[in-house]
Amino acid sequence: MLICFSFLSHSQVGINTTSPEGVLDVNSATSGIVFPRVALTARNVAAPVVNPNTGGAPVNGTYVFNTTTTSTGTNDVYPGLYVWYNNEWVAQYQKSDSKVFEQTNRGAEGLRTVNGVNAIPGFINETFTPKFSGTYRLEIIVNYGGGFAEDKPTSSTTNQVNPGSGHRHRHTYVGDEHNVVSQEGEFTFNFNGTNYNVYANSYSTYNAGQRYYAIWFQTSYIVYLDLVSGVSYDFNMIFNQFENTKIQNNGNSGDGRGYIGVHVPCYAEFNFISD
């Protein structure tokens, strides 16, 4: 391969060009420039790169291609191009890491729930392994709908405190024609041993022989997590449905059971935010 160098009086260098248009002008239709390949140990450590004139830290604007991955949890580096600027190596590529986990049983009924703990398929003994060390945004999206409300022949409005949650159920009965019942429960997302709880509430109605149920309500919960690259974090999600005597079979069987993920599944999304 013939390489042509051009040196002008004002110190311009051209490679494969006789008319360089900058201090250094490299011309090739098939090849690129290979930056020095080094094994960095941390973003805030200059070594093994040094300034060849002083033997000290490199000057701002020094480029290298890092070949290593660290996973200390602080100032980690990953393979790619870096520039030294203000006493640290700054990555010259976008750090992007995202993963979505979804409820696996979905559709017209989703998961039918009973009183007490209900494991949610798709969130049973799962793991997430981050690509980078730093802050991740975890968004948990859940939805829940109640089962059949009971028929009631009397007119009244009552409030009942659920001992499991401290929340009040509101029940409205209007003759034998109309019954509105609030059904509730709580999602628990356990990530790496820490619980994140999301309260859920839904209304079921009975009106002159017409039933409205599985009227699901969607809610979200956002948490920011400091994670270490390459470490596998365990997580699970369950739903605890509270007993309600105004739902058929107390909500524990048959048409009184609740609904999770009707047509739209519950999901959890991890997104890398920053170092």
Model-derived regions: residue spans:
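Short non-domain terminal segments
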Residues: 3-5, 63, 185-189
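Extracellular jelly-roll beta-sandwich "head" domains, especially the C-terminal globular C1q domain
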Residues: 94-275
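N-terminal start-of-chain detector that recognizes signal peptides
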Residues: 4-5, 52-54, 206-208
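N-terminal signal peptide c-region/cleavage motif recognized by signal peptidases
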Residues: 6-10
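C-terminal trimerization/auto-chaperone modules of long, extracellular attachment fibers and adhesins
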Residues: 1, 12-126, 259-263
